């Protein structure tokens, strides 16, 4: 049978990231292209223990349908985790458990963009965001990066343009692909511009927990008093990516639209994975686990920088 693929999907390109990952199975190749977390950082024993306990003691809790927002007790555990150092989730914010952060990017575009609308993105930006936004018909407006984050004058020019963007997508902590971290001053300025021009910020934070040097910089969401910031947090780098678990924190009015998008997409996130994550958050010392992950990456980073300095002294890179 000949299938007539829709115009929208014919214009979409396969995920570059997935194509890169295919090459990583080649035993003759050492690839630095994919962002696979270190396998020795996965808490496999804890996951196995909690999974076995759950399936033996309360299998229905893991195997039955659940609400689209996420299991209520899981959402409370995630809210507490997100708020343990700074106030990410406030009274007017909802928490949605999603099937990875990619789903949050997809929902933001679906809920905020019409065909032909503009989305502002850092330039360069995370490749995985491109298809998520373009699948909803969005056009991308790139904003150049500087060493301390996005160029503010360029960002304001995009915000002030006749075709005002529907939102601004950024990764303030260890930006993908540059590795740069947005300064506190620029985060405050980005938030001020967002409020002034009425452009929401989609703050993607998959790497914030992995800081191996220096002090954490407050998230843009922690500054949010107007419901202007959509925060995407992920468990892929601090638990494991195969569980496909992330969480979105945003104003409850927008969250209602995200929940409908969730119902149309996959009904709800894997309940077993949610329950195991809840056990990890409430019954283990997650901060101690994250400290061990940082040690793993600190050693890898030190070796990588040593080799770059020795073998590629002409190369400039983000430390």
Tell me what each language-model feature is.
Residues 278, 295-305, 314-319:
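Conserved glycine-rich beta-strand-loop-beta hairpin in the small C-terminal domain of fold type I
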Residues 35-39, 102, 126, 173-175, ...:
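Short, solvent-exposed loop/turn segments at secondary-structure junctions
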Residues 8-100, 107, 282, 302:
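N-terminal small-domain helix-loop-helix segment of the aminotransferase-like
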Residues 61-198, 202, 208-226, 297:
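Conserved core of the PLP fold type I
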Residues 58-59, 282-286, 308-317:
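Inter-domain helical "communication" segments and dimerization helices
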């Amino acid at each position: 049978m000949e299938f007539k693929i829709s115009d929208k999907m014919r214009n979409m390109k396969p995920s570059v990231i997935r194509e890169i990952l295919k090459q990583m199975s080649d035993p003759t190749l050492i690839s630095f292209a994919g962002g696979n977390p270190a396998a020795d950082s996965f808490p496999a024993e804890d996951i196995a223990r909690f999974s076995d306990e759950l399936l033996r003691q309360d299998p229905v809790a893991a195997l039955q349908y659940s609400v689209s927002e996420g299991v209520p007790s899981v959402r409370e555990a995630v809210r507490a985790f997100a708020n343990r150092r700074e106030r990410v989730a406030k009274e007017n914010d909802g928490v949605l458990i999603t099937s990875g952060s990619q789903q949050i990017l997809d929902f933001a575009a679906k809920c905020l963009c019409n065909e032909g609308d503009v989305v502002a993105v850092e330039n360069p930006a995370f490749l995985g965001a491109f298809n998520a936004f373009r699948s909803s018909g969005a056009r991308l407006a790139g904003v150049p990066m500087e060493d301390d984050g996005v160029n503010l004058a360029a960002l304001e020019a995009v915000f002030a343009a006749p075709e005002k963007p529907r939102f601004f997508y950024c990764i303030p902590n260890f930006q993908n692909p540059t590795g740069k971290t947005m300064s506190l001053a620029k985060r405050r300025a980005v938030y001020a511009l967002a409020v002034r021009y009425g452009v929401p910020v989609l703050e993607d934070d998959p790497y914030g927990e992995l800081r191996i040097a220096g002090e954490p910089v407050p998230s843009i969401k922690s500054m949010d008093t107007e419901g202007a910031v959509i925060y995407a947090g992920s468990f892929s780098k601090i638990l494991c990516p195969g569980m496909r678990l992330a969480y979105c924190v945003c104003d409850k009015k927008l969250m209602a639209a995200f929940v409908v998008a969730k119902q149309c997409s996959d009904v709800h996130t894997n309940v077993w994975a949610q329950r195991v994550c809840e056990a990890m958050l409430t019954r283990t010392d997650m901060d101690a686990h994250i400290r061990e992950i940082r040690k793993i990456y600190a050693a890898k980073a030190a070796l990588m920088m040593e080799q770059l300095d020795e073998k590629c002294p002409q190369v400039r890179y983000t430390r």
